[in-house]
Structure formats: structure tokens, C-alpha cells
Swiss-Prot record:
Record-given protein name: Kinesin-like protein KIN-10C
One Pfam family recorded for the sequence: HHH_3
Family that this chain belongs to: Belongs to the TRAFAC class myosin-kinesin ATPase superfamily. Kinesin family. KIN-10 subfamily.
Binding site for ATP: G94, A95, R96, N97, S98, G99, K100, T101
Amino acid sequence: MTSHGRKVVRVVARVKPSTDLASTKSISVQKPMGDDSETVTISFGAQFAGSKDSYRLDYCYEENETTGSILTKEIKPLISTVFEGKDANVIAHGARNSGKTHLIQGNERELGLAVLTMSEMLSMAEERGDAIFVSVYEVSQETVYDLLDQEKRVVSVLEGAQGKIQLKGLSQVPVKSLSEFQNLYFGFKKSQKLTSDLPTRSHKGVMIHVTTGNANSGSLGRMNFLDMAGYEDSRKQNSALGPLEIARVNKSIYALQNVMYALNANESHVPYRESKLTRMLKDCLKGSNITLLITCLPREFSQDSFYMLNLASRICLGGNRAITNPTKKKINGLDRSVSLSSAAQRRQTPLTMSAASRKQTVLRGNVTERKTKINTATSAIKARKLFGEANDSVKCKNSSKKVEGKAKMVLKKGISTSKVVLSVQASSPKEEICSSITVTDFQSSLVEEEYSLAFSSSTVAMEPGYSNGASLSSEAIYTTDKETPRKQEEMFAGATHCDDAFVDKAQIVERDENNSVIEEDLTLVIDEGENLDKENNSLLANETASPPLSMRLQELSNNLKSICKFSNQLSVPEKHQTPLTILQAEEASEHSDITAEAAVSIELRTPEKTMPSNIGCSPWKTYSAHSSKLKNSAVGEYLKFINTAGKEDLKKLKGIGDKRAAYIVELREESPFKTLDDLQSIGLSAKQVNGLLKKEIGEIF
């Protein structure tokens, strides 16, 4: 098998010989190098809708080539591997009436592949002094029957501790001559015709065991011949079988196709458990064992045959992909880490002007009120530390998405707003971030994306100026609407984390490694409606005699520390759950000079519904609610333990042995267990999973 020894599954086609020479041939086979071609191309007439131009397989035996040529080129190399201790498989599949049974079994006049192979194996066993035993089985409706037993007993497919498949109840009959094998093989066919009352379709197989002497000695290898049931479209109305039985047969065919593709593509997971047939042949298919998949095609092409040829070509292409990338399975984890690191680098890359402009949000509409603009020169908001290293703005993006939801909710509730335009520009010449956010009236049409804010009525404009990138000056300009009286405004200097809260006015100055000064100004207005003249006079007086810059920076730092430490969680009454709420802050720490009346914060976030202790004023409802919360907590801790514990710790759980623990460790590397239903992938049913969890929780009490 030098030409195709690297492939686990070799996919070939066989065109069924036709006795009617006058019938037209619809299949065309292209062999670039004749009989020595490593791949061939099969095409057919254009009368089949939805078909591709051609299909590529490893080889195709045309109708003028005999069964002996298949034996010489394909089967004999497999026989030598069986006597070397490996398993080999010959599987014939295709549509109905495509010649599968005749190819494998043959008849008394024209021998099939199974009989011809047995003749070769008997002669080799006689030379080597080995013994041969035969098992004949049938798989019908996900049940395995022993055809050499007179009562056709059911064969149990069991899996041992080491993962080895055991076929309990499958008899092995010694065979010393070809006539004995023919009597066994064709004898069960005659008895089957007598006992079958209703038309049934099943998969039939012959398993030839090679042992060193007798059945009790060590087994060398096995040769399997499998005659698959014919594929048939379940939508056909003229079928003698019911649609349920056709669906079951097709399901087992699909399961075998998936296993063949996974083996040929060298995938890490092979779905042996999808059907009883693939689970039964697991030991014969896995590892370095070789499989010959023969796709039988009739001379007169049908839609069912076209579909089976399409599946066979898919399996063949999977083998070519595995040969092209032989180390894919080994470096899968490395590829995953490289992709994660590259994704992290993309997240840490600062936004450029073009990238930020794509994030702009514009809410267009007809505005009837006076338009007011807020121009704020700032950089991207930094996270957590006031004088720390510059961090990326990924966290701010999540907060902005939350703000967008709140703003849209406010607009839907009919809150009249002025048009607000927020322009953000970076202070450093190397960074230019410009995003505009526009909010219109409730009557305007809402259109697009992210960072949209909704503020009520009047606004405040901050215009900071810079001197040599190190000095800071700010001037507050207060504007009011003509229709309303002058409104009171409270200033509160501070800064917040982008995921925690928004403060009325926050000015944060940071020096990065390039000695660039970044100022963050976040302005928001709280309307009170009284004592405006006195407050404005006092504010102007404070501005004329402002303290030194260092003292102001120290005060801002202390304010930020106190806010981050003592900020309260948002609590909203059930009758008035709005996204905009004003919280009176608790008294700050001893480092803060701001009173509780001035510490007013507005937090834009969805209110969390807390679970009251008197749900519906019913003790039973209260108990049920707390029980549900306790159950969810227990399930979460159990899944967390499954995803993080080592193999030895997993074995301490009830019902988890060495094999299941190893399987859990293997599966969670690909994808962690998120729900209890995911534990069914290790071979547990939903009832068994619930039983394991009950045992673990029951030991607490």
C-alpha cells in the first residue's frame, strides 16, 4: 500500500456491471495516469439538477473490471496487515440496487470479495500455522443479532475499563476450508429468506478472526466485510418500507459517514457513539487500522446514487486535508493560544481617527427646540488609577453600550431633550479620537449604533485650555433655556471608573510616559430651581481665588479614592424604576473635604431586581424562591469544580471513576462544561447526572 498507505480510509467507487448492453451509460471516469492514477474524477450527465461538474475519489473500478481486480489491488495488501496484528475493514455502501450485496457476498456461481478473501487467508494461515474463526452478524434498528446462532440471539456491545469493545454473545465458528465458510455464509442467507415475513433492511457483516492456534490463544487481527443497507430518500412514496424504518437506516449511514470523515481528516473527536454499528466497530476502525470504503454506483444513475457519491467525495477530500496538514492535531493548542494573543493585541491597539469615526453614533430627526453643544477636550477615559499606567478603553466601550440602552429607554418614555453633540479629541498629537454623539427629541427617528446619551433640558460647557501640555485652566459657562427660570447647579469634582458611576464634573489629569497631560471632563447637570443668584455669585467668587494647581490635583485624588471606596449601589423603587437616578453619597473619608450634600452622583445602569423576602406575602413562595436560588448556586459550584479540579479530585465525586475523570479532563480542554446537560457528553444520561448531584448535596446533611 505504498501509493495510499498514508490514508486511514481509502475511498473508491465501483460501477455495477449491467446485463443490458443497450442501456446508456451516464457516468464518465477520468483517470489521468490510467490504472496507476492516485485520484480519479467522476462526472455524469447534466440532467441531474444541483450536481457539481465532477467528484474526486481515490479510484474507480468501471463495469468492465472484475471483482478479482479489486481483490488484487485493494484486498491483498490488507490481508498481509491482518496477519501482522492489525485490523482491516471493507465496507460497501450506496443506493438501493447498486450491487453492494453482490460485490461482498456474490453467489455460488460468481464469488464475492468475502469468499475470495477467505480463500487467500486460509492459504496464508495454513502456511503460518494460524487458525481462522468466523462471526456473522446483522444490525437491524440499532440491535445486533448473531446470525450463526439458530435463535438469532441479541449481541451486547459493551465497553471495558480500558475502552476496548466487547461483543458479548457473538459466536466464533472455526473454519478450515472454503467449503465450510460457504456453507456458513450462504446457509444463513437461505434461512433468512424463509423466516422473513415482512420486508426489512439491515446491515450485514462478516468478521474473520486470525488467531495463533485456537480461539483461546492470542488474536492477531480481524478482517471485516460490511454490506451496508441501501440509502433511499424517505420522501419517496413507492417504497415498501415505512418512513420510520428508512429514517433509521439513513441515520446509521450518516453516522458511518461521519466516522469515516473524522478518521480521514485526522480529527481529535470521532463520533463512534452516534450509532450501534460504529460503536461496535470502534476497535476495528480506530488507530492505524485501514478501511476500504467502496461506493457502489449503478449504470443508470439515480438521485440517491448521486447523493451517496457526494458523501464519498467529501470523505476523500477530508483525507487530502489531513495529508496537507499532518501536524494540525499536535499544534491545535498552539494555534489557539496564538489566535488568542493576536486577538488581545487587537483589543489593546488604540483607536485611530478612521476607526473611531466608524463608531460614531448619529440619531437624526427634526429638532424643534434650541440646540446646545457641549465641547469637551479629553482623551479616552482611563481605568481605576488616577496616576497609573495608561490603559485601553475596552472597558469604557462596555459601559457606553449600557449608557446607550439607558438613553434609548429615556427617549421612548417621552423625555424631551435638547440636541447634544459631544466631541472628543485627544490631547496628544499622536492620538486623535473623534466621536460624536447626538440625541434629539422623542419625536425624532432613532437610527444607529453605540455611545448615545440622553440628558434633560439645560447643559454645561467646559472649555479647558492647555499651556505646554502641563498647565490646566477651566471656565464654567452656564446657560439656561429662555422658557424656564434660571436653575440651580451644583458642582462636584471627581472621577469614576467607567463601569461604576458617572459624576457631575470630573477633571482627571494624568502624566504618561511621554509626559503628555490628559484631562478628562465629564459634565452633567442637576436642576433644582431655586436660590440660583446666590449660588452663582459664590461660584464666581471661588473662581477668582482658586487654590494652586497642586492642591486641586491632591483634592481630586482624595475625592476619587473616597468615591470609589464609599459609593453605594443603585437602589430604585419598584414603582419608579428609571435609568436616571440621583443618589446622595455617604460621608466621604477623612481625606475628603466634600460634604454629603455636594456628593451627588448619577449612575446610568439597569436596576437589578432584588428578591424580596415576602414574595406575594406567601411563605411558600418565599421558600420556593430561596430554594431555587440555592439550587442554582449548588449547580454552579458543581460545574465550577468539574471545570477546574484535577483528575484525582474528580475521582472523589460520586459516580466518577478513573475513565470518566480522564474523559472530563479531555473534553473540558476543548470546551468547558456550562450546564448539567453538557455532562451527557461523557456518557451519562440526564437522570444519572441529577442522581450524582443529589448524592453530593445529600452528604452535606
